[in-house]
Amino acid sequence: MNLQHHFLIAMPALQDPLFRRSVVYICEYNNEGAMGLIINKPLENLQVEGVLQKLKITPEPRDPAIRLDKPVFLGGPLAEDRGFILHTPPDAFSSSIRISDNTVITTSRDVLETLGTAEQPDDVLVALGYSSWEKGQLEEEILENAWLTAPADLNILFRTPIADRWREAAKLIGIDIHTMPGEAGHA
């Protein structure tokens, strides 16, 4: 089982406030554990434009057709002061890792400097913090019915309205998440 470039979809019974009704995009999955970003929990009162202002980044030349009023997401409870930018290729930035043919994660400032310009990647999701699981921990949580898994979908990752991402991710595997009992699988 390789969960890289997959969604973790919180089961209705998962009540942890941070992960309740969350969708996590798995960026890295290997024999040491897993790392991902929550893609449906926007931070209140923080948009991409505000991050750029705090970092004193002024897009040059500014393309007014590109909106910078998009939300910044809480990627998870770890390193909440670090930025993680999920985007579509190119991966020519100084600190980029290709997750799949169509997704890249970058942690360097140079990708932020392209935001709002014609050079920015086509699709971008900015998150602060990340989620992580030690070796075997995520698999155990899946066996305990905390999570559903589904192959990632770029439309859900970048374009689906935030409030719909949990439901739409579950639909990828034929599940209507709103009709699932809270204790599914615990017969």
Swiss-Prot record:
UniProt feature coiled coil, ranges: none
GO CC terms: cytosol
Protein name per UniProt: UPF0301 protein ESA_00394
Upper lineage: Bacteria, Pseudomonadati, Pseudomonadota, Gammaproteobacteria, Enterobacterales
Family stated for the protein in its record: Belongs to the UPF0301 (AlgH) family.
InterPro entries attached to this UniProt entry: AlgH-like
HAMAP family, sorted: UPF0301 (MF_00758)
SUPFAM superfamilies per UniProt: VC0467-like
